[in-house]
Amino acid sequence: MKINQIAVTLYTIRDFCQNEKDLFESLKKIKNIGYSSIQISGVGLIDPKTIKRMCEDLSLVICATHEPNEQIINNTDEVINKLNIFNCEYSALPYPLNVDMKNLEEIDKFIEDINIAGSKFHAEGKVLCYHNHALEFQKVQNEIILERIYKN
């Protein structure tokens, strides 16, 4: 795999991305290492236009974002707008926070919510991705949770 096919997820260096100055210094280091793409996640409350400008100044591509559940589900249009600012097609839901993954009713409500958001993404030419973890490989009522998510 070539380095231009790999992106750095900012979540791994989130402690150094909480304000504009630190973020820009971190982005410069990422660029100097040789990366050309990043995934926005775990950064502080920094205006998306400022982040985009920083990336443009350094010739870094924003290939994806990770957004909290509540943002994707309750503020879908805001997330899509941010993707438009970033000239980015992909965002991922990083973790089923506040969802009891042993409760089928909660799982199904979560699936319904992300399907609604996913439909809005699709209508705007964006892709909502799902970042799974080990917990989605558990079974509830004899069905693997991740299979239920993808099936519905």
Task: Please place each PLM-identified region on the residue numbering.
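Active-site acidic/histidine proton-transfer and metal-coordination neighborhood
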Residues: N69-N152
